[in-house]
Amino acid sequence: MRHLLSAADLGRDEAVALLDTAETMADTQSRAIKKLPPLRGLTVVNLFFEDSTRTRISFEAAAKRLSADVINFSAKGSSVSKGESLKDTAQTLQAMGADAVVVRHWASGAPHRLAHAGWIAAPVINAGDGTHQHPTQALLDAFTLRRRLAGPDGPIGTDLAGRHVVVVGDVLHSRVARSNVDLLSTLGARVTLVAPPTLLPVGVESWPCEVGYDLDAAIDAGPDAVMMLRVQRERMSSGFFPSEREYARAYGLDAARVSRLGKHALVMHPGPMNRGLEISADAADSARSTVVEQVTNGVSVRMAVLYTLLAGGPDGDSTTSPGSGPEGGTTP
């Protein structure tokens, strides 16, 4: 794997290998000293053209826990705000010796352009591009599902075959929905999208999933997890739904709907949440909720991605294992 640009680029075995590596990383993060040596001497650049809190901090934590140096670049206040192009920015990073670039961009396809235009030699990781893809979010969601739903033998080596995940809400503007449909279906899960017709994209019938319009019917189908999507009001003008109150009534997950879920069903949300709109406070804070766990797992998953791309991964040419060295001790 040279870059991570789209969840659709991952095959089943490749995805499972990343998730297994993330399990190893997660095990090391329970230690008093969490820092590991594999990326010592390498520089990871977080190149963010859109505002972000969780994703940027998560990538920064992941890189630093692998001993990489991190440069955080924000478009605001930089030469980009003065009109510098993506090409010029990339060539500047190349000249400075960036070993990996994590990019978030408002334009769909920008990370792919950066990776394949020949402007930079470093691996590129897509941290979200427009309404297109967010592959590490899909990986951390799959990691959370696999870990929480694992059988007695644990999650290592397993996929999500036979599981049913319902994804609810603003699919039209959601790169998380697209990435999860791609990855979860690759891992064998059945995925159902539930949204008002106005918040479904053109061509959704060609996606590897089912589509419905009734949240209550989807809950009654007994899914293993319900993933709520943030209503992205900043990407909307008007007319997508009659009112926020009506949206919450028809498509919001509240305590009553949570109570009808199966005994082991999970409540997920990629964050940030609009409490009281797509999810109630009771649902978000319930024992079924994995919202905080997803944030924790995001660091382990992003460590696995950086390790795989920059250190050769568990089956690559690197002679350094994730848990070796003075900072980390030995791999458990």
From Swiss-Prot:
- Residues annotated as binding L-aspartate are K82, R175, R230
Q: Where does carbamoyl phosphate bind?
A: R54, T55, R104, H134, Q137, G271, P272
Return the annotated region ranges for Disordered: 312-332
> What GO CC terms are in its UniProt record?
cytosol
Q: What does this protein do?
A: Catalyzes the condensation of carbamoyl phosphate and aspartate to form carbamoyl aspartate and inorganic phosphate, the committed step in the de novo pyrimidine nucleotide biosynthesis pathway.
Task: Cite the record's note on assembly.
Answer: Heterododecamer (2C3:3R2) of six catalytic PyrB chains organized as two trimers (C3), and six regulatory PyrI chains organized as three dimers (R2).
Protein name as it appears in the record:
Aspartate carbamoyltransferase catalytic subunit
Which taxonomic lineage does the organism of this UniProt entry have? Bacteria, Bacillati, Actinomycetota, Actinomycetes, Micrococcales
